[in-house]
């Protein structure tokens, strides 16, 4: 998940540098969503993950 977030962030930065406003906004929004989903899944796996015997 974090990899996809970083990929979308890089796409957004490149698009912003080249002046593609709509594409940069879309990629930045997608990066934020993927990042938040990744954090939520990490926290869920942290609390429900490996149990001690």
UniProtKB/Swiss-Prot annotation:
Superkingdom in the source lineage: Bacteria
Matches recorded under InterPro entries: DUF1328
Membrane-crossing segments per the record: 4-24, 30-47
Topology class, membrane: Multi-pass membrane protein
Keyword entries, A-Z: Cell membrane, Membrane, Transmembrane, Transmembrane helix
GO cellular component, one term: plasma membrane
Cellular localisation: Cell membrane
NCBIfam families: PRK13682.1-4, PRK13682.1-5
Entry's family note: Belongs to the UPF0391 family.
Entry protein name: UPF0391 membrane protein ECA0470
Phylogenetic classification of the source organism: Bacteria, Pseudomonadati, Pseudomonadota, Gammaproteobacteria, Enterobacterales
